[in-house]
Amino acid sequence: MSTPAMLQLGLFLVVLIALAWPLGAYMTRVMQGENIGPARWCAPLERGFYRLAGIKQEEEMGWRGYAVALILFNVLGVAAVYALQRLQGMLPFNPQAMAAVSPDSSFNTAISFVTNTNWQGYGGETTMSYLTQMLGLTVQNFVSAATGAAVVIALIRGFARHSSAKIGNFWVDVTRMTLYVLLPLAVVFALVFTQQGAIQNLSAYQDVHTVETVKYQQPKQDAKGNPVLGKDGKPVMEDKTSQTQTLPMGPVASQEAIKMLGTNGGGFFNANSAHPFENPTPLANFLQDIAIFLIPAALCFLFGRMVGDRRQGWAILAAMTIMFATAVVVETRAEQAGVPQYSSLGIDQRASQLQSGGNMEGKEARFGIIDTSLFVAVTTSASCGAVNAMHDSLTPIGGLVPMFLMQLGEVVFGGVGSGLYGMLIFAILAVFIAGLMVGRTPEYLGKKIETYEMKMTAITILVTPTLVLALTAIAVSLAAGKAGIANPAAHGFSEILYAFTSAANNNGSAFAGLSANTPFYNIMTGLAMFFGRFFMIVPILAIAGSLAAKKRLAVTGGTLPTHGPLFVTLLIGTVLLVGALNYVPALALGPVVEHLQMLAAR
């Protein structure tokens, strides 16, 4: 790994922690009901929302009531986003006259944005009206992130409270997270992105004259619009030229800010953050990396403060950071090493002052290997899924890294809320394993971990591997699944495995060589996203309710310290072991085989 790459990684981590520490302190006070900062002038608005909805702020819920409210809220969100897409042709703010989205794509997209996945089987600039983007997708970017944060806050209350039947009020948690944390941060980042060059308007698309004439070929058509075929049965191509280009417009910066802060990832444009209107400069690119990790990192500090031991938050953050930094190193080395076959084609892959070198296929020249590799690791460590390069064009090991980061359960920082509650589940598993090894009843943060908690933990951990492996097996077994594969053999399998890994773990990135906008993939990935989200959340809330009802145990000489290097090592080992056991056979059929084939073809 080169010196510039190490310096950028170091700078990224320093800036991240410097911003996350005060944000964590602020979020702690906000979620505990203190009126500070924006809460002072937003408090009347908050109370107005409660009166309008008939919510009593002081009334808390048990875990079942919390879960029911959460699921109802999200199901209504799915219905609203689905309706917007189906009716957008008749609604305003549609200067390009976008037609209604197909039923299967609308179903997929509605679930995708409500579950914080933002998997996209469509191109935003050719499919969605401005109203759908703003009122449907951007709104869900806020509330889906707030939902994840609410769940982890409820789980933390389970650890912090004792002899209590309540874990909080879902409506209050979502409202406060949105009003006081997500909205102010989104305004700041949107203004910065606009200053950097991201667009923000409601104008119709602009036709402009290009600097030079573009020459291209397209299939010749007869009078009825059917392709003309040659004697060999292939379409007859005809030469075309163009001196104009259509530039898409839209309210991009406002959506881009919450897309990153909420670890959502769905792009306004099909190229996502590789598009210069979304991610215009290297500085904007760096700030997008920071935005993705900012709230997940701050939640670690919030965790330490709420349970009364800040060292606990540092331990969780340390485990996440070690795994993330390792992933960045492996990703950067794999992409900088390049592809051996390129050398025989006369392609220079050596780094120099004029080029990044390495595997530049599918990457933006303005970002190069270092910026791209960091972004790849960030977006798949978090459940973001935004991309500034095409992951399908990564080297086999370069593609394995983001896939494996997702397969760990999106716990390496992870999504807003979902990353921390996933890591806390692994922490419970780690102390259970440690307890078995020394013959003691396991406990974590003063709470005894018993049969009920372990049953719920097992369900939580097994949900996503079951979905990923079962749906991948179905897809490679059916003609409808195999029809979407654009690449043969190992890489084609990797495309399907990546798709369901991304969907079930609520990431949203893709190996774009898979043609996924079909009824089969829209329905299958939609189900993976829905069950991958809510079949994890409900058991986690059950754990929160069970822990809150327990009495706090006194620390003794036999209590396992959960704030030191030993526990950090145990936690990392548990996460990696579970990931390896679940997915290594599938990875061996995809990226591992592909890497060996690449080396053999030198």
From Swiss-Prot:
The keyword Cell inner membrane applies. It is found in: Cell inner membrane. Part of the high-affinity ATP-driven potassium transport (or Kdp) system, which catalyzes the hydrolysis of ATP coupled with the electrogenic transport of potassium into the cytoplasm. This subunit binds the periplasmic potassium ions and delivers the ions to the membrane domain of KdpB through an intramembrane tunnel. Keywords: Cell inner membrane, Cell membrane, Ion transport, Membrane, Potassium, Potassium transport, Transmembrane, Transmembrane helix, Transport. This is Potassium-transporting ATPase potassium-binding subunit. Residues 231-241 have a biased composition (Basic and acidic residues). Residues 221-248 are annotated as: Disordered. Its main location: membrane. Belongs to the KdpA family. InterPro entries: KdpA (IPR004623). The gene is kdpA. GO terms for cellular component: plasma membrane. The system is composed of three essential subunits: KdpA, KdpB and KdpC. It is a multi-pass membrane protein. GO terms for molecular function: P-type potassium transmembrane transporter activity; potassium ion binding. The chain crosses the membrane at residues 5-25, 65-85, 136-156, 179-199, 283-303, 312-332, 419-439, 458-478, 523-543, 566-586.
